[in-house]
Amino acid sequence: MKTNLITKSKSITNPEYGCKPEDREITDYINNGVINLDKPSGPTSHEVDSWVKRILKLDKTGHGGTLDPKVTGILPVGLADATRAIQLLLTAPKEYVCLLTFHADVPESEIRRVFEEFTGKIFQLPPVKSAVKRDLRTRNVYYSTIYEI
C-alpha cells in the first residue's frame, strides 16, 4: 500500500555550507547527530536518554518528546550540539502504527466507520497515568490507513 508524502515546506541547501556525509569525521556525527532509538518497554524516555549520554561519554543529550515507560517506539536523541535541533522535532508531524485487539467480534464496517472519526482535527486528553502533563490538546490527523482486519 502506497502512502502519500506530506510536504510542509520546500527548501534548498547552499552547497557552500557543510560537507558530504562521506567526508565527515566521526566526531562530527557524535557532536551534531541524532540517534533514532527504538525505546523498549520499561524505562522512561529520560532513562534511555541518560544511557546514551553515559555510553557515548557526552556532556549533553536531549530526547525529542516523551514516551510513557510501557510504550515502545522511536525516541529521537540529540547528541551534544544537536540537542538544540531536537526542539524542532517536538512540533514536527509524526506517524504512528498500532495493533488493536478487540474483546468481542466487531463488524468490519463499524471499525472503518469509527476509524474515519479519527481523521482531521481531534481533541486528545492524555490518560490519568501518563508521563506528560494532562492538558486537552488539539491534533490534526492527516490520514489513517487500515492495513489488515
Model feature map: region roles:
Residues M1-I149:
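Catalytic/RNA-binding core of pseudouridine synthases
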